[in-house]
């Protein structure tokens, strides 16, 4: 590399020279995601799914029906099962029943909120929820992180 300086040129001339030295892309090809790194997308790529896909727990705690808790604050709930990320609870949940639920676990349809463990008092297979819970409290909604049809790669 030479240490010699060239005389400055006008910006328009520099832009023209730069654009003239660039090869325009005139064709496209389909490649696997593994081979796409460092390439330019020919079109916007959109998500085909919502993430998360379902309602899921945002915290570790106990899944309950918020209306049932509101009707009887500090109610004693019977813990009838556990839901973990990748291992949903698939039993039937009745009145006065709760499940222990971990962050990322799919919410059962009978429950609409999660009480954080810090707001609960557990003894054996029962739990008292000491906090007031609104509907959808401590839950992630489908599409909260990534909405279906959202552009994930721009052209």
Which residues are covered by each model-predicted region?
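Short, glycine/charged-enriched hinge/interface segments at domain edges or termini
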Residues: 2-6, 12, 62-155
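Short, low-complexity N-terminal leaders and the immediately following helix N-cap/first helix
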Residues: 1-73
